[in-house]
Amino acid sequence: MNSYVCVVGAVNLDICGRPSRKLIFRDSNPGTVTLTPGGVGRNIAHDLRLLGAEVKFLTAFGGDSHAQLLRNDCVELGMDLGCALDVPGGRTSTYLYITDERGEMQLGLSDTDISAAITPDYLSRHLDELNGAAAVAIDGNLTSETIAWLGAHCTAPLFADPVSVTKAERMRPALGALHTFKPNLTEGQNLTGESSPEGVVAALLAQGVQRVFLSMGGDGILAATRDETVHLP
């Protein structure tokens, strides 16, 4: 049995600023600034490591100090970065956000253009690693072209997290190739045109997805295959 999982997706640095008192716009506010490793792909890889899985992480790092910080984090977690891509002069993916004094987000800025460097050409050089994996997990930060290429060329079971409503559209060309898909209800509704959770799941299965885990916030998860549907609170 294959002993590792490949994760293809984003790693980014989350920078959070939180004021110590009521936020005043257009002024300098005293508070705290924290830096935290993030990114959907990186978080999936982290969770897999916590479960004891061996992980090969295929992602893109820029040529800045953020890249080294994130590389060190991934290595400390035990991820294999042997297939990761370095982009000289590139900006490592960064998410900057400001909250109010209660921690509620007021403004966010996302600089994730480097994910476009994860191209079919780059992945084709690592196709043996991808197809030799027990599973391949991808996120919606990849371009639609890259996702479609993975759907056409990856023979390992393909798992996908769409990330957001807008980025979920990028999954459309590869839906028929997905083994497991984990959208939330809004993402699923926008992809299928269905309104009910049951309708969303049925439509995704009809398009070729083998397993769907539809998250519904406080209403739990609807898990389904073509033969069985289970509601998990």
Predicted regions and their residues:
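Short, acidic/turn-prone active-site loops that include or flank metal/cofactor-
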Residues: 12, 32-35, 111-114, 162-166, ...
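Conserved phosphate-binding/catalytic loop of the ribokinase/pfkB sugar-kinase fold
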Residues: 86-87, 97-135, 140
